[in-house]
Amino acid sequence: MASPDRHFANAAIFTHSTGLTPNSGDAALYIKSDNKAYIKDSAGTEAAVGGGGTKTYAVFNANDNQPPATNFATLDTRNSIAILDFDDTTDESAIFLGIIPEAAVLGSGLKIRLIWTATTATSGDCVWDAALERMNTDIDTDSFDTAASVTTTTNGTSGVPNYSEITLTTIDSVVAGDGFRLKITRDANNASDTMTGDAELIAVEVRSAA
């Protein structure tokens, strides 16, 4: 039987040996300890296959909100786009429910990406919080893990979307296949939240932080 590290002219070699340098005209393809595929040419140059892009695990829009019983963001529309209005004086929240997909990489936590705009403001900062709950306890009681936050200055032109990203490392020990709830809150009473008027949440992305 031929060795898996055997060279063939102008061929891709599938190998477990990350230290292998292919012969001229060959390329080596292998999986590293981070479970990502890499390719190496005969000059020894290594590159991640597929560009090493991040993985999106869930996407939510305003209509996916399952609001809390009190202090909830209000469903609204803007130019027929569904949005959630978050007050500038009271902390209001939205909750989204999903399932962590198979083969999700969670060792570094999750990144929560928010797309939002201001109702009228063209200046000021908005503070957003994100908290995750693993759905493995009594659903009659909330059990969200510690929240993480981000502060973003709103766009200087009304109606232009802002993009805020929160790195969430406290993820309630969630694993692939688990149901989860994600709570998004505008921390309106935070001294760093200086934006006047509502913040309008358009969409939320949950993706790998790796």
Q: Model-found features: residue ranges?
A:
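Glycine-rich, low-complexity segments
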Residues: 1-16, 36-79, 136-164
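Short hydrophobic/aromatic-rich beta-strand motifs
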Residues: 23-40
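Short carbohydrate-recognition loop motifs
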Residues: 75-89
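Short beta-strands within extracellular/lumenal beta-sheet-rich domains
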Residues: 88-104
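Extended, low-complexity, turn-rich repeat/linker tracts enriched in Gly/Pro/Ser/Thr and Asp/Glu
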Residues: 102-107, 117-125, 136-138, 191-192
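Short coil-to-beta strand junction motifs in C2/discoidin
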Residues: 122-129, 197-201
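Cysteine-clustered segments with highest specificity for TGF-beta superfamily mature ligands
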Residues: 162-191
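Proprotein-processing/basic-patch segments
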Residues: 186-210
